Amino acid sequence: MLGMEKYFINEDWSPLKVFINRPDGFRVIEEISYKPATEWKGSIQGKYAVYLLRKRGIDHFTVISEISKILHSKIHYIGIKDTNAITEQIVYTTNVKNIIEKYENDKFLLTFLGYSNSKFNHTGNIFEIEIETDDIKEFEKRVNKLRSIKYLPAYIGYQRFGTKRPITHIIGKMLVLREWQNAIDFLVGYPFESESELVKKARYAYMKGDLKEALELFPKRFRDERIAIKLLLRNENYFNILRNLQTPLIFYIEAYQSYLFNKYLSRIMDPTKIDENLVIKIPTSYDSCDSICREIFREEGLLNINFKIKELKLNVKDLVRKAYTLIRNLTIKDKKITFALDRGIYATIVIREIARTDPRLFT
């Protein structure tokens, strides 16, 4: 699923029933120079005004857009955090005059920390996850096994593809193939069982061609779906609709690259030959591929395709990523598993390896 074709630890583990109470049972703390962002101390002056953002159950782009309006400035960040979690991270702005000491609503808390003259060394993230399982002793045994191995394949986790609706990579593929209508159809249509009944009805209405009903049904937080439908009602073409979406289109293309990376990693990973410096490259064209990459590109129908979409002014870069990741400070106590991972590594790959079950149950 999502390119993750097999498990890493060579044990005949049966699936465990694992549940994580989202968002409250899943906490992510950004790590700055190997210390929690919550411990970062600012200076009394500097060219950046620095804030601690604590959010709960809200997606990254929505909260950044809201903060930008509150602070009347472009917001900079060093990592995109999980939507379905309680997360704490650094955000900063060059607007050092109009400081808001604290802002809070039901979704996020913004607290001014001070100033900085330099940007931040984002070393990773700390995860604190409360586990509910039918066999905690077996879960703890597997955690201890993982602690002895120390490494896991650096799969790109489920959040990158969408938690309730893991489809961002498919939209990305449609963009790469220049199939504009299909990209919009996958964005707005094709409901998943994990979605609410209201949203499923909205997507079904779109697929039936009832655009007005779909627009009425989609909640306001589904910004891009609503934008697409409104423009279709004005007879706008699909290419121009894509250009008007709020989510950056490169987000979808990078999700597709992530899917290809996972497929590649599944085919080369070996627990007996862990090379912590091994790097995998997913280039933007078939001609730049190695033999394994070419095999995957052929399977995906990408022989004469370039990921750099000039029509949309998207200068996509090669995806270069380490094959393996070190799991730091792994502990489990009172059904809470805690560990730190390097930047860009997803906690769900750790739980997936231990539980051997459908990650959508805990993503």
Swiss-Prot record:
Keywords: Isomerase, tRNA processing
Signal sequence bounds: none
Enzyme Commission number(s) from the entry: 5.4.99.27
Active site residues per record: 82 (nucleophile)
Reactions catalysed according to its record: uridine(13) in tRNA = pseudouridine(13) in tRNA
UniProt xrefs under Pfam families: TruD
GO terms classed as biological process: tRNA pseudouridine synthesis
Domain TRUD: 151-363
Any GO molecular function: tRNA pseudouridine(13) synthase activity
Xref: HAMAP family: TruD
Family to which the UniProt record says this protein belongs: Belongs to the pseudouridine synthase TruD family.
Purpose of the protein: Could be responsible for synthesis of pseudouridine from uracil-13 in transfer RNAs.
Protein name as catalogued: Probable tRNA pseudouridine synthase D
The species this protein was found in: Sulfurisphaera tokodaii (strain DSM 16993 / JCM 10545 / NBRC 100140 / 7) (Sulfolobus tokodaii)
Gene expressing this chain: truD
